[in-house]
């Protein structure tokens, strides 16, 4: 009953108004899975390739008809008749058929959409929720947890049209007893932040991930206004709510000069100086997690950063590791960072994503499941976070349906699982247990 009878691809629109790939996988017995590929703005150079058409007369070159042709043509032909329950085999067929190191023939956007749609179809055929099916694929059947959210409530960098260099300033509602309570706390801080920003004469328009995107005097001011909002919401900073940042430092790294150029603040730093700048912020504010604190190629700098901060806080590799087990293995061996950001479309299949999560956990690294800045209503990452018991999730702020869809799915899952899926809060963050 889980044999694939049809694979279908279509071009849909993501949260930034750009096309993306949506796929359907149909099985015997009428079971159907549907999934869409997300898309990033600040991307690591070693990510799997997102195939775009390049036809400037259509969607300004961002069309995905070539990827759709791959889904409806060679991918569909290769998968019809295969057993959808064997996810590893399904993904292996597509990867082998593509035949490139970075999935550039069909596009990671094509392969991923089919991979996730297949998992959803298989879950339907088994009569179980997607998170339960993912747990079985992961070899951890019946082991679930609700993730601690990192809520991106001030957007900067590539995610906003403002003068803030650091890309994301996030809150973690660590004082919550449940995921649902964490979402409520996040929403309350978010609304209070709007009031704080308005009182200072700042803009309250939102960026790509639903966080506010004001022009600020400094990166430290972003943390200061969040601290005010946390207090205004009736919570204690450092106890009820902790802070996290995604520097996305590759975006302001001048490769030729070898310096970090923070134009918003009018400052430049060497690797070592920037590490000490971050350490200063960690001393000043209850920051428990920093992502991509240096350029993806600055491994010597990351080694220094890990020595400086790795025992105190979580250091997450996003552009650094790009959900790739080969790169992660090298990072583990060299003691670089202590956590990995997990993005499906950086690697391009569910099987490879699960392998990256397992490798991280086996090495004592944490895994943070993440959205992309270009999203859809697809909430698969919520099921991935619960089904792998990853412990943490990054899926934007408390506005924009493309972000809130994931929180709402987590609320539903928590309701269904009850005590079978504990919410462990701050214990999930590396260095904070």
From Swiss-Prot:
It catalyses: (2R)-2-phosphoglycerate = phosphoenolpyruvate + H2O. Keywords: Cell adhesion, Cell outer membrane, Cytoplasm, Glycolysis, Lyase, Magnesium, Membrane, Metal-binding, Secreted. Its cofactor is Mg(2+). Binds a second Mg(2+) ion via substrate during catalysis. One of its GO terms (molecular function) is magnesium ion binding. Mg(2+) binds at residues 246, 291, 318. It is found in: Cytoplasm; Cell outer membrane; Secreted; Cell surface. SUPFAM superfamilies: Enolase C-terminal domain-like (SSF51604), Enolase N-terminal domain-like (SSF54826). Gene3D superfamilies: Enolase-like C-terminal domain, Enolase-like, N-terminal domain. Its EC number is 4.2.1.11. (2R)-2-phosphoglycerate binds at residues 167, 343, 372-373, 394. It is an enzyme of class 4 (lyase). GO terms for cellular component: cell outer membrane; cell surface; extracellular region; phosphopyruvate hydratase complex. Pfam families: Enolase_C (PF00113), Enolase_N (PF03952). Pathway: Carbohydrate degradation; glycolysis; pyruvate from D-glyceraldehyde 3-phosphate: step 4/5. One of its GO terms (biological process) is cell adhesion. The active site is at 209 (proton donor), 343 (proton acceptor). Pathogens have evolved a strategy to activate host plasminogen and manipulate plasmin activity for their benefit; plasminogen binding (even without its activation to plasmin) increases their adherence to host cells. Plasmin activity leads to degradation of host extracellular matrix proteins like collagen, fibronectin and laminin, facilitating bacterial dissemination and disease spread. Enolase 'moonlights' as a plasminogen-binding protein. HAMAP family: Enolase. Belongs to the enolase family. NCBIfam families: eno. Component of the RNA degradosome, a multiprotein complex involved in RNA processing and mRNA degradation. Catalyzes the reversible conversion of 2-phosphoglycerate (2-PG) into phosphoenolpyruvate (PEP). It is essential for the degradation of carbohydrates via glycolysis. 'Moonlights' as a plasminogen receptor. Binds host (human) plasminogen in vitro and Hep-2 cells in vivo; an anti-enolase antibody decreases adhesion. Plasminogen binding increases bacterial adherence to host cells; plasmin activity leads to degradation of host extracellular matrix proteins, facilitating bacterial dissemination and disease spread. This is Enolase. It comes from Vibrio parahaemolyticus serotype O3:K6 (strain RIMD 2210633).
């Amino acid at each position: 009953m889980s044999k694939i009878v049809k694979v279908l691809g279509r071009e849909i629109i993501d949260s930034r108004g750009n096309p993306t790939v949506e796929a359907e996988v149909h099985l015997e017995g009428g079971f159907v899975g549907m999934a869409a590929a997300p898309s990033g703005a600040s991307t690591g150079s070693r990510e799997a390739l997102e195939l775009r058409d390049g036809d400037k007369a259509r969607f300004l070159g961002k069309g995905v008809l070539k990827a759709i042709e791959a889904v409806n043509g060679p991918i569909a032909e290769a998968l019809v008749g295969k057993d959808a329950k064997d996810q590893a085999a399904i993904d292996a067929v597509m990867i082998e058929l593509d035949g490139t190191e970075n999935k550039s023939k069909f596009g990671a956007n094509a392969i991923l959409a089919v991979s996730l749609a297949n998992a959803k179809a298989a879950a339907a055929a088994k009569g179980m929720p997607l998170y339960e099916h993912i747990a079985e694929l992961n070899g951890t059947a019946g082991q679930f947890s609700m993730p601690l959210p990192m809520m991106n409530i001030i957007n900067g960098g590539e995610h906003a049209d403002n003068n803030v260099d650091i890309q994301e300033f996030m809150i973690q509602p660590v004082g919550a007893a449940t995921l649902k309570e964490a979402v409520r706390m996040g929403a309350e801080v978010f609304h209070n932040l709007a009031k704080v920003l308005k009182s200072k004469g700042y803009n309250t328009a939102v960026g790509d991930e639903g966080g506010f995107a004001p022009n600020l005097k400094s990166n430290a001011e972003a943390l200061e206004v969040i601290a005010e909002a946390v207090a205004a919401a009736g919570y204690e900073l450092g106890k009820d709510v902790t802070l996290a940042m995604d520097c996305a430092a590759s975006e302001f790294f001048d490769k030729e000069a070898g310096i970090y150029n923070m134009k918003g603040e009018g400052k430049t730093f060497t690797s070592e100086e920037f590490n000490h700048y971050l350490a200063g912020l960690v001393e000043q504010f209850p920051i428990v997690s920093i992502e991509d604190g240096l350029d993806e190629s600055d491994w010597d700098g990351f080694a220094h950063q890990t020595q400086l901060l790795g025992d105190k806080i979580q250091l997450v590799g996003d552009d650094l590791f790009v959900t790739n087990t080969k790169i992660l293995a090298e990072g583990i061996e060299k003691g670089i960072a202590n956590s990995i950001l997990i993005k499906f479309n950086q690697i391009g299949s569910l099987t490879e994503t699960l392998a990256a999560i397992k490798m991280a956990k086996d090495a004592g690294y944490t895994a943070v499941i993440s959205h992309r800045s270009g999203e859809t209503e697809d909430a698969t990452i919520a099921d991935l976070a619960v089904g792998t018991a990853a412990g943490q999730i990054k899926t934007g702020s408390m506005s924009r349906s493309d972000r809130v869809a994931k929180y709402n799915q987590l609320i539903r899952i928590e309701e269904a699982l009850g005590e079978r899926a504990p919410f462990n809060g701050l214990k999930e963050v590396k260095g904070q247990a």
